């Protein structure tokens, strides 16, 4: 896996070069960071909302571009949303760590494959 940034914030190493997707990735980082800072129900709900919105946009772009890896990519999104959608506040450290690691590995390991293809 890739190094998990501390403090947990988006940096240039995560750029996918699609402005909307980069901005949405920043919001997911912030959503996870806010759950670290305050693992309350409103912060968890915000994380689920911004993640769902982002996945919808990213998948629409992949569909429009007829991106070849769209099916396994959507499955990863679905699995992650099921995981975070099933959490309840307060979110424990193990699940926060899971989210932190999943996002870093997903952007750098999976999203980076669509650079220049959407």
Curated annotation (Swiss-Prot):
Question: Where does the chain bind Fe cation 1?
Answer: 25, 54, 58, 111
A single GO molecular function term of this UniProt record: oxygen carrier activity
Keyword Metal-binding included in the entry's annotation: yes
Q: Which residues bind Fe cation 2?
A: 58, 73, 77, 106, 111
Q: Which PROSITE patterns does the annotation name?
A: HEMERYTHRINS
A Pfam family annotated for this UniProt entry: Hemerythrin
**Which keywords belong to this entry?**
Iron, Metal-binding, Muscle protein, Oxygen transport, Transport
InterPro entries linked to this entry: Haemerythrin, Haemerythrin_Fe_BS, Hemerythrin, Hemerythrin-like, Hemerythrin-like_sf, Hemerythrin_metal-bd
Keyword Transport attached? yes
Q: In which tissues is it expressed?
A: Muscle.
Family named by the database record? Belongs to the hemerythrin family.
Tell me, in a sentence or two, what this protein's role is.
Answer: Myohemerythrin is an oxygen-binding protein found in the retractor muscles of certain worms. The oxygen-binding site contains two iron atoms.
Outline the subunit composition: Monomer.
**What is this protein identified as?**
Myohemerythrin
Q: Which organism is it from?
A: Themiste hennahi
| Lineage summary | Eukaryota, Metazoa, Spiralia, Lophotrochozoa, Annelida
């Amino acid at each position: 896996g890739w190094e998990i940034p501390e403090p947990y914030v988006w940096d240039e190493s995560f750029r996918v070069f699609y402005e909307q997707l980069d901005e949405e990735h920043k919001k997911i980082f912030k959503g996870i960071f806010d759950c670290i800072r305050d693992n309350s129900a409103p912060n968890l709900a915000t994380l689920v909302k911004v993640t769902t919105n982002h996945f919808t946009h990213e998948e629409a772009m992949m569909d429009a571009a007829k991106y070849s890896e769209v099916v396994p990519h959507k499955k990863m999104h679905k699995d992650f949303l099921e995981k975070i959608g099933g959490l309840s506040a307060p979110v424990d450290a193990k699940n926060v760590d899971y989210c932190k690691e999943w996002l870093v590995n997903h952007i750098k390991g999976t999203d980076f494959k669509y650079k220049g293809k959407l």
